Swiss-Prot record:
It is an enzyme of class 4 (lyase). This is Ribulose bisphosphate carboxylase. It comes from Thiomonas intermedia (strain K12) (Thiobacillus intermedius). The lineage of its organism: Bacteria, Pseudomonadati, Pseudomonadota, Betaproteobacteria, Burkholderiales. RuBisCO catalyzes two reactions: the carboxylation of D-ribulose 1,5-bisphosphate, the primary event in carbon dioxide fixation, as well as the oxidative fragmentation of the pentose substrate. Both reactions occur simultaneously and in competition at the same active site. It catalyses: 2 (2R)-3-phosphoglycerate + 2 H(+) = D-ribulose 1,5-bisphosphate + CO2 + H2O; D-ribulose 1,5-bisphosphate + O2 = 2-phosphoglycolate + (2R)-3-phosphoglycerate + 2 H(+). GO terms for biological process: reductive pentose-phosphate cycle. Keywords: Calvin cycle, Carbon dioxide fixation, Lyase, Magnesium, Metal-binding, Monooxygenase, Oxidoreductase. Mg(2+) binds at K193, D195, E196.
Amino acid sequence: MAHDQSSRYANLDLKESDLIAGGKHILVAYKMKPKAGYDYLATAAHFAAESSTGTNVEVSTTDDFTKGVDALVYFIDEATEDMRIAYPIELFDRNVIDGRFMIVSFLTLVIGNNQGMGDVEYGKMIDFYVPERAIQMFDGPATDISNLWRILGRPIKDGGYIAGTIIKPKLGLRPEPFAQAAYQFWLGGDFIKNDEPQGNQVFAPVKKVIPLVYDAMKRAQDETGEAKLFSMNITADDYHEMCARADFALEVFGPDADKLAFLVDGYVGGPGMVTTARRQYPNQYLHYHRAGHGAITSPSSKRGYTAFVLAKMSRLQGASGIHVGTMGYGKMEGEGDDRNIAYMIERDECQGPVYFQKWYGMKPTTPIISGGMNALRLPGFFENLGHGNVINTAGGGSYGHIDSPAAGAKSLRQAYECWKAGADPIEYAKEHKEFARAFESFPGDADKLFPGWRDKLGVHK
């Protein structure tokens, strides 16, 4: 049985409202269950100790100052498994170079050793609150979706839906076919991203692919009269490799460098990779991909943290945009209520699962919607979210269109315009060919979402 530390690391008389008003603590909410035979409060206190100044025994080197920065359990509800801990902001590591906060220190404390404690069955972080002073000390985004809207010639407020795709197949295209796939989409759409495994494969080296992609962009811009955007994957183990890829691409794009975003796989690569991109390339849109996150964020996982927490951290780190799933409308795990993830990262204040968070003017992070989306699924998605100020990267939804990738891109745009106009999708399809052909391209979705569509659109098997 662990040493009971509740007299030091718990104070259930503390009021959450007072802690928030004081502005000196980061508050973290968990779902925590002790292992059988362990007391809830004692386990919670041990959890707080391991997450701050303590260990499993008293040590002789502890002094009064140390006790002043203890993390404190201030709320528990054993029946609902709710546990909340207040962490003094002095606990968290600061940069030597500029005194700023870092997410690695936050993660090390609030979701570090406590994930492997012998008396804890599970503990999952579901929300956290950051006071104004700590908000000021995180980098936050340098660019946001308004920068992209400006490039696209749109209003910088409520500039609307950015129709994007992912080059498919995700691997196996050589440089010329890769660039041709980009060109075909750009004839109808706005934004292309590398799929997360695409980098510098021997059959598609970066130094051959990127010049061809830029040439494809210029040709598409000339043909359509519209600006185009490309998000390049610079994910790598090594800082110098990341910068080598980024610097090469910036040189290639030259006068169109503002149309180049940098994608980092922030979950597998870690916070250091996100910060490298944010600080070394503050003029570029920072595209946070989250491959692998489901290992801990999935509702089926009892440990780690939620997708909501991951997205909220990404804004602090400086992500211009982060993938947030499809809220139950695509192929990825999720549900309609996940829209709160989008609201938290795009608004200046928002109610989370537990805490009301103010961002004090920190730039927003764009929700990026990806994973099994196509034109037929978009109207319902927008209705659930309540707006269309997102980037949507639809790979299969574009390259799977029966006519062409350009037609697929146009069908995505038309789906947004359909929702924006409050139109009936079937009636809208009758006047918009690419959207109508999306019904034939994705008949399984059409049957499920719009029963009777064949007769209404005059399409027969």
